[in-house]
Each structure stands twice: as C-alpha cells, then as structure tokens.
C-alpha cells in the first residue's frame, strides 16, 4: 500500500529477459534498509525487490504487467517515480494507493499557467465512472486531485494542476503531450461503484 507521494526518481539502468523481464533501477534510497521481497511503487506499479546493491534495486516484471502499463515504461533510460510501501505510523499525505494499474491514459495537452502546469489526460470509457471533480486519481504513481471532468465519445477527459514542486520531484517535469501514463482510480470510488451496481440488481 502506498500514498502517491513520490520520494525518489529512479532510472531504468538495464533490462534483461529471463522469462520475466528483469529490470534494474537506479535509486537514491539507502538500499541497505530495503529487504528483498519489499514492495516499491514504480510509476504506479507495485513491484517486488528481487535484488539490490548500493545505488540500485532490481525487479522482475511479468508479461501481464508489461501489457497493462504505459508503453515504453520498461526501457533503459526511462525515469520512474518511486515510493516505498507505507509503514504503520507514516503520514498519509496523498490517498490510499494500491499500486495496481486500472488503465492507461494519454496526455492530451500541457499548458503552463502561472508557473503551474495545466494537464489534460484522456482515458477510456471503463474508467469514466470513477473519475470525478475534486476526487483523487493516481497518475504514474502520483496522488493528484481532479479539477474538472468531461465525458467524450471515446471515454473521459480530466484536468489536473501540477504545481512547480510536484513537477520538480516527479517525472512530470519532463511530461509531453501524447505520452502514455499509468492510471489508478481511487479505491473508494471502486467500492462505491460496485455497491451501486449491486444495489441496482436488488
């Protein structure tokens, strides 16, 4: 479990196909304090540490995970938003994030307004019921508040405001229009939608 508050930006240093894809990621984390088997969110994807050394950690990424995450994410040189798993007593600064990607979004536009970045992201119809104004959503592992929502023929578009600090401490500072991003809906929205669906069958 995570909070969507990024604590490091890692870089994919190397990949190797070993059945699953073995991915080594550089990090500023003190890896001596990271146990093998620990969970780390990598741009919104919960992965298990399978190897480590000073300056890097490694993960095995399944074909299923690769197929459900943003295109180009698992390539050398790619920057990743990193967050270690939430521990009892930690501050919950964002919202509850599971590290399970619900869908892929596409950055439609980025506009700088007063130092902040106004970003529009498009997603498919399967996510539309779960995106609400002033609700929470996780984009590439970052907990964000939705400013506005528009239903479209292709699904849904929503607006985000990225303040300078968030852009500086995440990969959003280098985000480009047309780029694919990992999306995770608010777990509370997921449960509420399920309850509403069951109520309709009663």
Where do the protein language model's features map onto the residues?
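Conserved loop->alpha-helix
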Residues: 1-202
């Amino acid at each position: 479990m995570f909070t969507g508050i990024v604590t490091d930006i890692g870089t994919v240093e190397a990949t190797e196909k070993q059945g699953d894809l073995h991915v080594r990621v550089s990090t500023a984390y003190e890896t001596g304090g990271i146990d093998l088997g620990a969970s780390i969110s990598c741009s919104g994807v919960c992965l298990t540490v399978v190897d480590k050394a000073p300056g890097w950690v490694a993960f095995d990424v399944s074909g299923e995970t690769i197929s459900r995450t943003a295109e180009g994410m698992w390539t050398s040189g790619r920057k990743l938003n990193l967050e270690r798993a939430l521990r009892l007593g930690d501050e919950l600064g964002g919202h509850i994030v599971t590290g399970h990607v619900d869908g892929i979004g596409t950055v439609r536009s980025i506009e700088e307004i007063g130092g902040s970045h106004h970003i529009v992201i498009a997603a498919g119809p399967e996510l539309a019921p779960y995106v609400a104004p002033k609700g929470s959503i996780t984009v590439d592992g970052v907990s964000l508040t939705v400013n506005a929502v528009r239903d479209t023929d292709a699904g849904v578009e929503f607006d985000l405001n990225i303040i300078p600090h968030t852009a500086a401490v995440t990969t959003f500072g280098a985000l480009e229009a047309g780029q694919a991003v990992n999306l995770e809906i608010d777990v509370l929205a997921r449960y509420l939608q399920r309850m509403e669906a069951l109520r309709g069958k009663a």
